[in-house]
Amino acid sequence: RVKEDIFDIQDEIVKKITIALIGGIEISSLKRAHRKPTENMTSYEFLLKGKDNHHKFTKEANEEAIKNLDLAISADANNAQAYAWKACVMGQAFYRGFTEMTDEKMGELLTLLEKALEVDPNDFECHRMQAEVYLSMHDFEKSKASGQKATNMNPNDPRVISIYGEALIRLNELDKGLLYLQKAYELDPIPQGQTTGDRRLASLFLAHYLKNDLDKCNEIKDKIINIDNRTWLLCIDLYNSCSKEYKEENWYKEGLNEFKDLDWSLEVDRYHLNNQ
């Protein structure tokens, strides 16, 4: 048993080092890309700039990311990830209200994903992106299918197993989904573009909320630095269902003030919950 534990620990160390190395390689390549004139940049470097701008989460950076990815595609029409990331950037623009989501725009987004997988059907990143987009469209079965394909190809990428876990919990496969969400949190608690582990923790909170586990939800809530409106609202619902008092709690008072002007119908739609 001790030997098995040692091998498990070694596996975890290797996984975390691999994640760090890949991230380090991308950062080094991105720094070189920033020093190059545009006319000398490769498709891969344009792709990295697009990904970097995507993770800045502003309207201006989103628009710049689209330009970067268009240039990546122009430089190499067989860069599958450039198509997939452009679809992701468009999805971000819809989600954050940077641009209006029309049938035409959604058609373009889906065409980009189809093109990405046509170019390289074995690119796990493309399947991951497809899972993300299907989740945002509330097509949870397709999100699960794409997430499973990506996970089969790369079971140790926290972004991959995270979206797979998100799809699973929305299909009421709670225990299985929790395993993947917990593993993603352990491998990479602070995702790229984030400064805290709040996003991963919010996903775990949702899973335990769906299991109606107040104690575990409270444990996770106390680890979150800035509670998002979904976690806040679901926490209220869970307290109510358990007949627990909460109106004197700091988290409730702070959220009441912070979220008072939100368009709740829009926000709840962004939770991508399964109404069934």
Where are these regions (language model features)?
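Flexible helix-coil transition and linker loops at the boundaries of alpha-helical arrays
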Residues: 34-36, 74-81, 114-124, 186-197
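Alpha-helical protein-protein interaction modules
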Residues: 109-113, 126, 134, 142-276
